[in-house]
From Swiss-Prot:
Modified residues (Phenylalanine amide): 9
GO cellular component: extracellular region
Locations listed in the record: Secreted
Disulphide bond pairs: none
Protein name per its UniProtKB record: FMRFamide-like neuropeptide FLP5
Record flagged with keyword DNA repair: no
GO biological process entries: neuropeptide signaling pathway
Domain of life: Eukaryota
Similarity section: Belongs to the FARP (FMRFamide related peptide) family.
Keyword terms of this UniProt record: Amidation, Neuropeptide, Secreted
Length: 9
């Protein structure tokens, strides 16, 4: 959901 999670994974 969060953009930061997408950047990390």
């Amino acid at each position: 959901s969060m953009p930061s999670l997408r950047l990390r994974f």
